[in-house]
Amino acid sequence: MRNNASRDEYVPQHGSRYETKGTSSRGLADARVRVTKIAAIGMLTLAVIILGITVKTYASERTVRPDASTVQLQNEKVSKSKASADQALSTVDLKTRLSKADFNDIPSGDTVRTFSLVDNKTPALEDESLASLQDALCRAQELGDVGVVFYDLSSGRGVTYNADVEVYGASSYKALYALYICETLVESGQVSLDGPLATYGGYSMGWQTVRNLIENVVVNSDNDSFIALRAAFDHDGYEDWIANLGVDDETALNPMSDFPTYCPRTSAKLWREMSEYLSCDTEASQWLSGLLASTSRSFIRDGIADEQVLVRNKAGWISEDGYYSTCDAGLIDIDGCTYVMGIMTSMPWSDRSSEVTAAIAKALFDTRAALA
């Protein structure tokens, strides 16, 4: 069929070539008809070609347009990435300034005060937030002394009450001692988390790994494990570590007790150091971070009561042998911001003191918008 069509297509051309001379009017008319048909066919062919080119061009344009959109989208992502990077650099710079800040600038006294560690922009609390915090603090004062510090690590702004009241910290100090071991000894290679440690004396537990002891200390608040760690590592640089952080060594190195008496201001300094260490991308730092997020008791976590909020803490509680304490301190992460919270009280531990401490934590947390 294809060859026949091809031959038929060329017949009119031969006819028009040889029969136009000296032919009859009818023959001439036939020739004109043939020429007209040829022209029509040619026009049709040209139209098809033009249509094909147009369709192809349109198809090409449709193909190009998504590519252009993709490029634009990628450019937007790059811009956002650059903005995020700039913001990250700004945050790092702010943290650097914050790390050099004098924590003695945190105001003291038995009134709720706000402060800034990096500039003169002192925040103002909303009346409702201030009233809730004052109410929770008053309830605590009915049972003992109380002091708090709460601040935003990104802005350096915070709120405090009685920042220098010294109370028995009980188990709240255990996480900070674990910080000393990991940051100073493990990261330097002096101590291996999986290395065996002999425990002895009245609290002998046989051979334990450093990892197991720290986990028992942080997650389960085990006293025997804590005493074993202090006996093993107090003389390996602990005093220098404390001094470099600007902490009163007489408070942190009380020879009469493995559990220091200290204040919210000291707690704020040490948990700022904790935040710096946990931001490091090391096996030990990430492991310790996970332990702090898994503590068996947290008055802060109970008070905030929000699964979207990450709380890494260590609480302390006791009501026996003349020692009274209900404390909690840690790091709170929400919406890309990290806060340091320290609550130190001499309330004898009970269900009521636990509820009051949780209420203080909630009231402090609710002031965060003013600290940005």
What are these regions (language model features)?
Residues 2-140, 158, 166, 278-296, ...:
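Structured C-terminal helix/loop/strand segments within mature extracytoplasmic catalytic/sensor domains
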Residues 142-166:
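Short, conserved catalytic-motif segment at the N-terminal edge
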Residues 156, 166-197, 217, 341:
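Active-site SXXK
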Residues 160, 214, 225-279:
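Mid-domain, small-residue-enriched loop/turn segments at the edges of structured enzyme/sensor domains
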Residues 163-168, 202-206, 253-262:
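A glycine-rich, coil/turn loop motif that links secondary-structure elements
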Residues 183-209, 281-285:
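Short, well-structured active-site flanking segments
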Residues 212-221:
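Short helix- or helix-capping micro-motifs
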Residues 260-319:
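A conserved catalytic-loop motif detector
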